[in-house]
A protein has these predicted regions:
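Bacterial N-terminal signal peptides
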Residues: 8-19
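A short macromolecule-binding patch
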Residues: 61-73
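Short nucleic-acid-contacting surface segments enriched for D/E, G, S/T with interspersed K/R
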Residues: 79-97
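Short boundary/loop segments of OB/S1/cold-shock single-stranded nucleic-acid-binding domains
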Residues: 20-36
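OB-fold/S1-family single-stranded nucleic acid-binding modules
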Residues: 100-127
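Short, structured beta-strand/loop micro-motifs enriched in basic residues and often containing a Trp
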Residues: 72-80
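Conserved hydrophobic positions within beta-strands
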Residues: 40-42
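Short aromatic-glycine-enriched beta-strand elements
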Residues: 48-59
Length: 129
């Protein structure tokens, strides 16, 4: 194998590792010290890898304002006895969520907990939130 091939291979690995680290460094996108409580209607569930996404329609006066919540992968929830059916049962109903707000101040947050209409408290944190 030529030294050029080895150097090229090493560079590719280093570039991919940097991209993977940046993607999984949630503190780059979310301010863990800026917690918000969102109350509204669960409008959408995107249950897929690598992260689930929920849309909660909140009220801003008379205007409906969607708030996007990003959570861990579906497998994270399955390991904690939470299924998509738990979220499906909440579609169109009132929920309350706690999230770490996006650093850019947009209506986007990293899901910490969500209280479902069934009374089930769902935690999206690997340890205590």
């Amino acid at each position: 194998m030529s030294s050029r091939s080895i150097v090229s291979g090493v560079l590719v690995v280093l570039l991919l590792a940097g991209s993977a680290w940046a993607h999984h460094n949630m503190s780059a996108y979310f301010d863990f010290n800026n917690r918000v409580t969102i109350t509204g209607t669960l409008a959408k569930i995107d249950w897929r890898n690598p992260h689930i996404e929920l849309i909660v329609d909140t009220k801003n006066g008379e205007k409906v304002q969607p708030f996007r919540l990003e959570g861990p992968a579906p497998g994270f929830f399955r390991d904690r006895d939470v299924s998509r059916a738990d979220f499906d049962g909440a579609l169109g109903k009132a929920v309350t969520a706690e999230a770490s707000r996006a650093r850019d101040g947009s209506d986007w947050g990293l899901l910490r907990t969500m209280m479902l209409p069934s009374g089930k408290l769902v935690s999206a944190c690997p340890q205590n939130c």
